[in-house]
Amino acid sequence: MTITISAVILAGGKARRMGGQDKGLQILGKQSLIEHVINRLQPQIHQISINTNRNQTEYAKFGFPVFSDELPDFQGPLSGMLTALEKTKSDFILFTPCDTPFFPMNLLDKLKSAVKNDRTLIAYACDEEREHPVFCLMSVQLKEKLRHYLASGERRLLQFMKENGGISVKFTQEEGNFENFNTLDDLKKTVI
């Protein structure tokens, strides 16, 4: 089974715990968080887009297509995912958040293997501690179900995935980690 895949970095949230600062544009070391994410994604996949609901001009400077949620009012990652699924020409989209710069370099390979081997429409990451559903490979075939799910008022990402046959794919600490940065203090405490 040959499938086409593109990637979308989700940077469309309000970042309330970061004092409203745009997470993806915050600096860790000498680069913004989104630059760290791009640097980890590029060896894995070439077709990358950025989903953001503000600072589009700043994000466009990274050289990738930028788009906003079609649904208003910052409705969470599923809103960005739905917009991406409606716009893509790919069979699947690899989603990553903009605030998690150390995710595994084999993220796409393992999620793609799970999709192919288990013939599922969604595979998402987990580690020894918990599930990380924003790191997922999702089929465009789910866009209608996702549209109806959001229209019903639901916003729970993991619930949507489980209701639609999503499977978790385990990653070890050695492969990378899913530590994200939610506050400016988190960034200040981290040395790279």
From Swiss-Prot:
Q: What stretch or stretches form a coiled coil here?
A: none
Q: Which domain of life is it from?
A: Bacteria
Main enzyme class: transferase
Record flagged with keyword Signal:
no
Q: Name one GO molecular function term.
A: GTP binding
| Record localization | Cytoplasm
Q: Which reaction does it catalyse?
A: Mo-molybdopterin + GTP + H(+) = Mo-molybdopterin guanine dinucleotide + diphosphate
- Keyword Nucleotide-binding among record annotations: yes
- Keyword list, A-Z: Cytoplasm, GTP-binding, Magnesium, Metal-binding, Molybdenum cofactor biosynthesis, Nucleotide-binding, Transferase
Where is it mostly found?
A: cytoplasm
Necessary cofactors: Mg(2+)
Q: Name one Pfam family in it.
A: NTP_transf_3
Record-listed E.C. numbers: 2.7.7.77
Record-annotated residues binding Mg(2+)?
Answer: D99
- InterPro entries, per database record: MobA-like_NTP_Trfase, Molybde_CF_guanTrfase, Nucleotide-diphossugar_trans
One biological-process term from Gene Ontology? bis(molybdopterin guanine dinucleotide)molybdenum biosynthetic process
Q: How does it assemble?
A: Monomer.
Family the entry assigns: Belongs to the MobA family.
The molecule here is called Molybdenum cofactor guanylyltransferase
Species for this entry? Haemophilus influenzae (strain 86-028NP)
